[in-house]
Amino acid sequence: MSALSTLRHTFVYIMLFVALSWPVQAYALSIGEERLIGQKILYSVRKDLRILDDPDINQYINRLGSQVLQVVGPQYFDYRFFVVQSDQFNAFAAPAGLVFFYSGLIEAMRKEDELVSVLAHEIGHVTSRHLAQRMDKGTKVSAASLLLGLAGLALGVPGLSQGLFTGSLAAGQTINLRYSREDEEQADRLSFGWMQEMQRNPESMQDMLRTMRRITRYRMGNVPQYLLTHPNPEARLDYVESLLELHSQQSSAWTKTDNFDFLRFRYRVLVQTTDLDRLRQYCAITLAQDKDADTQRMARFGLALIDAQNRRFDQALEQLALVQGQYPDRNILRVDQAVILQMAGRFNEAKAILDASVHRDPTDMYGLFKLAQVEAASGNTTRAEVLLQQVARAMPEYPQVFFELGQIEANRGASGKGMFYLGKYYLYQGQEDLAVQNLRRARRDTSVPKHMQEEAEQILAELEHINKET
């Protein structure tokens, strides 16, 4: 993604943050209205940003989010957590429990507690309804229209609108930032308390804010203050440090975190979002110089992923074997081995490993999905379909699973069912026009099973409702 494109996307979603943050005049947005706007935002994000939705990445970030929510308590929304490709150091909480993490933020992290601290902070924004409470019913329609305009900006044709947004928001800079600072303090306070309840080390909040301060200082000359969703890290850092000092006697209750899963997740994200030569250099330096054993070992995992991406499969397997020797009980590394074998076209070896791995952990959707792909490539489409349906039930918004199902049906000559699955694939890829086109065809095709026709009709009706109401 180019620097201009990244800045444009950042501008769009920061404008979204501010657009939903006007001071309350009368009544706050209702839960139903917030959920509807959240759905619209998610479709826009899917269209304009690349979501890293591989099952292992998705399951990890959502599992961590669920751990935080267990101490938060019952919520109005079903929270969903996403990783999006952007080199920006940022995360944001959209309405209705949608929380997005930029890959640039994940790159800056070094341990799981840092990620949990940001997760908890963003959940704090949502539970406090910082966005929804500032939009009154009298401005709901114009704010919803503004969301559509913001989605248009993300397409790269801002025109007059960008100048209009910049000028009007700059004029209201002080009040917008004043409210934002209050929200940040409340979210930090909630995050700190939840981390204590989880026995996580809240010093990670301090570490993240120091990193944010460094990056903000570095970029401040290029990014106006009113374009920052999380302003004033200096004040936040002072506040968090005072909390740490106040609770310093509780440090013995903090549990040491196993960072294996985080480090694996981090490299899985980075290998898809950063320059591979630069990442290789980083891994080599970490392997040679880092004093933390897990960080050093998992740098070799990063090298294995890089070799696999460069189709140096033998070298990748050699690197991974060294990592497996240091973590012999980590089943996910066996899945990673099978994925490299799959990429190399060694399907029989990959299948044997994946069968055993899925048997050990049937909840691992990454292993299950990769096994389905191997079965399909080997001509075992019946079993592949069964496995893919399992993944689809567990991850109903994962687009690639519907693409694979559509391919199977198309190869069987079942074009109607293929169009149905292709419609869902396009839907969750953010390509609404193509989704509607294929779902309409599937709905009219008499060869398509009735339950699929009904689901297509339901999706089309929901899309029409969202577009009409927002």
What function would you assign to each model-found segment?
Residues 27, 39, 51-53, 59, ...:
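Extracytoplasmic and endomembrane cell-envelope/extracellular-matrix remodeling and assembly machinery
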Residues 103-117, 179-182:
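Short pre-active-site segment immediately N-terminal to the catalytic Zn-binding motif
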Residues 2-92, 173, 215-220, 282-283, ...:
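Hydrophobic or amphipathic, alpha-helical segments that drive membrane association/targeting
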Residues 100, 114-122, 126, 166:
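Short alpha-helical catalytic segment bearing the HExxH-like zincin motif
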Residues 57-58, 77-80, 135-144, 162-164, ...:
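Acidic/histidine metal-binding catalytic segments
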Residues 113, 123-140:
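Catalytic Zn2+-binding segment of zinc metalloproteases
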Residues 140-158, 163-175:
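Membrane-active amphipathic alpha-helices enriched in small hydrophobic residues
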